[in-house]
């Protein structure tokens, strides 16, 4: 959880942090390709293991002559001693230690105005240091780092698997009659040529067969699609580059992409592919077929206490998985949680998780808070507030899907543009849990202005639902449930800020946190006809469902009319966006060497 603090400007050793990220990537590759189990080997063991695996390839070392190195002490055959790109250049090995012990192996070029190397690091000016700690520079440096790691490991992996295929083919070929050998060799060579061509082919929109639309947002659309060669079912998000540039959303999209590529949790939606063309960018994510939690909540009204507790448990685990990656969501809503085929939830939509809100957004929220100073909010009972919210949902389908959006679940310090930490996500989850048990959000009003006013005066508005009417007695809260929500919806200094605090609260005393996905059957399990069943999403051929997106389409039309009057995004605006998820492709039998080509391995982050 401490990694959440990384969202602030970096004050420590940036080179060491980037080297740590490279180390994770390095270990992931080795484990994925079956070369070693990262946790069980030391760095020296890893180096020896790699040498054993790749020595038989008889690779010629690149730039191996001594004159290519500033000092003879730098020459090393170990892969883990290769220099890693970093905004603060250092000779770091995989463990983060200095690989080159000679403190004077770099020439002093300070007289020319260029940076000077000393004690293994570069002395930078104040202006250069300011650039180094910028989030954009950090990201670009990491992209460069990952690119070279991906490139060379994929090259080594290709050579290794090609040799394995050739060996298996030769073994099987000896068992075949002479009359068939020429034909089999020809087929083998043909497969290898196809394999090489496939490695050079860029992924494109045409590689996917769209099935039906399942979502629509202010900046793009989401489609259920099938990848033509692998038959993978994905949710393909398509966003226009010019629109993103005009609305200053490029950083948010890149943040979402970075989170998805980093995430390796059962609680977070997985990214399978990310690619782009001249007009659009594409995110192909795993398809979660059960719809979003908003739909489930709207159809259910009020959840029973043990059902609400189950979903709250999974939501806290999901947001903790995001926090452990070093990100804050800040804008959690029921729509951000999707229900999987098994009934368990996954967190998605990380576009605003960068930890940086644009000045325009902050200013607009401050203005909204000021505008509601004179708004007269009528006193309403809990029963009236629940009825108002349910009426709005039934009569105005746009209400819960507004592009502008009301701040029902957003912490006050975020709205005011003040400093905040990851506890703002616990505020949001407290609001969602309140809605699960009450049937309406704690600060909802009959209109958006009333909601803003309620949030500004949240201490007065936040009340425990209590019902005396016999028809509503079942909606009364348990004391431990109310106490828990009060620890989420409160001032930052008193608010829960860690999963450990949540787990230790009496309300969750009987929850088996380590085995939630196996120990409990979800209250709702989607009834699916096939892997491409999109029945739990809006039908975009239905006029009633499309009415929810009237405001979305109006905003898109307004943006489209404005886009041409502004400069287009720079060509490098989306650099480092491309991604393919990893899949093993080791040969398993000698017969496969003759009968079928191996599927091409997928690539990691590519420029």
UniProtKB/Swiss-Prot annotation:
Summary of subunit composition and partner proteins: Interacts with mob1 and cdc11.
Transmembrane segments: none
Compositional bias (Low complexity): 589-607
One biological process term in Gene Ontology: positive regulation of mitotic actomyosin contractile ring assembly
Residue ranges with Basic and acidic residues bias: 93-108
Disordered: annotated segments: 93-118, 586-607
Reactions catalysed according to its record: L-seryl-[protein] + ATP = O-phospho-L-seryl-[protein] + ADP + H(+); L-threonyl-[protein] + ATP = O-phospho-L-threonyl-[protein] + ADP + H(+)
Organism: Schizosaccharomyces pombe (strain 972 / ATCC 24843) (Fission yeast)
Active-site annotation: 331 (proton acceptor)
Protein name: Serine/threonine-protein kinase sid2
Lineage: Eukaryota, Fungi, Dikarya, Ascomycota, Taphrinomycotina
Skewed-composition ranges (Polar residues): 109-118
Enzyme class: transferase
Modified residues (Phosphotyrosine): 219
Compartments, record wording: Cytoplasm, Cytoskeleton, Microtubule organizing center, Spindle pole body; Cytoplasm
First-listed, main subcellular location of the protein, grouped into a coarse class: cytoplasm
Residues annotated as binding ATP: 214-222, 237
């Amino acid at each position: 959880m401490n990694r959440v603090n990384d969202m602030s400007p970096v004050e420590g050793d940036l080179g060491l942090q980037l080297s740590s990220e490279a180390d994770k990537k390095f270990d992931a590759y080795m484990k994925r390709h079956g070369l070693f189990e990262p946790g069980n080997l030391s760095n020296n063991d890893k180096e020896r293991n790699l040498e054993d695996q790749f020595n038989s390839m008889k690779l010629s070392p690149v730039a191996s002559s001594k004159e290519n190195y500033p000092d003879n002490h730098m020459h090393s055959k170990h892969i883990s001693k290769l220099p890693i790109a970093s905004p603060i250049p250092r000779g770091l090995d995989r463990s983060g230690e200095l690989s080159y012990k000679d403190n004077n192996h770099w020439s002093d070029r300070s007289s020319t105005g260029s940076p000077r190397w000393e004690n293994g690091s570069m002395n930078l000016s104040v202006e250069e240091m300011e650039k180094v700690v910028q989030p954009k520079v950090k990201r670009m440096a990491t992209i460069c780092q990952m690119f070279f790691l991906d490139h060379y490991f994929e090259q080594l992996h290709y050579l290794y698997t090609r040799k394995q295929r050739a060996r298996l083919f030769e073994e099987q070929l000896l068992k075949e009659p002479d009359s068939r050998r020429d034909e089999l060799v020809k087929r083998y060579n043909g497969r290898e040529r196809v394999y090489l061509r496939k490695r050079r082919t860029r992924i494109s929109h045409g590689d996917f067969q769209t099935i039906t639309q399942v979502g629509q947002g202010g900046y793009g659309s989401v489609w259920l699609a099938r990848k033509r060669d692998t038959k993978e079912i994905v949710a393909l998000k398509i966003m226009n580059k010019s629109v993103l540039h005009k609305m200053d959303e490029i950083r948010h999209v890149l943040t979402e992409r970075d989170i998805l590529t980093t995430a390796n949790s059962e609680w977070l939606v997985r990214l399978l592919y990310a690619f782009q063309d001249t007009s659009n960018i594409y995110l192909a994510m795993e398809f979660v077929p059960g719809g979003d939690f908003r739909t489930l909540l709207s159809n259910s009204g009020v959840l029973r206490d043990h059902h609400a507790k189950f979903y709250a448990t999974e939501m806290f685990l999901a947001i903790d998985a995001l926090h452990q990656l070093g990100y804050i969501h800040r804008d959690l809503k029921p729509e951000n949680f999707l229900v999987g085929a098994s009934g368990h939830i996954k967190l998605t939509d990380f576009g605003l998780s960068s930890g940086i809100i644009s000045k325009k957004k902050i200013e607009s929220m401050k203005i909204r808070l000021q505008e509601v100073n004179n708004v007269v909010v009528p006193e309403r009972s809990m029963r009236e507030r629940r009825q108002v919210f349910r009426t709005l949902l039934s009569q105005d389908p746009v209400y819960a899907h507004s592009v502008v959006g009301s701040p029902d679940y957003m912490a006050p310090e975020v709205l005011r543009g003040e400093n905040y930490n990851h506890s703002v996500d616990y505020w949001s989850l407290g609001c969602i849990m309140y809605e699960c048990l009450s049937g309406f959000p704690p600060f909802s009003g009959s209109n958006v202005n009333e909601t803003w006013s309620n949030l500004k005066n949240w201490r007065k508005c936040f009340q425990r639902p209590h019902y005396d009417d016999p028809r509503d007695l079942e909606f009364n809260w348990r004391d431990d449930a109310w106490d828990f929500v009060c620890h989420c919806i409160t001032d930052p200094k008193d608010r829960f800020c860690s999963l450990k605090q949540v787990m230790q609260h009496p309300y969750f005393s009987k929850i088996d946190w380590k085995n939630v996905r196996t120990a409990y059957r979800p209250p709702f399990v989607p009834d699916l006809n096939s892997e491409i069943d999109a029945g739990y999403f809006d039908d975009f051929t239905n006029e009633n469902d499309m009415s929810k997106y009237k405001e979305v389409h109006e905003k898109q039309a307004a943006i489209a009319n404005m886009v041409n009057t502004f400069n287009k995004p720079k060509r490098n605006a989306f650099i480092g966006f491309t991604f393919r998820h990893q899949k093993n492709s080791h040969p398993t039998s000698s017969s496969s060497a003759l009968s079928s080509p191996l599927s091409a391995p997928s690539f990691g982050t590519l420029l």
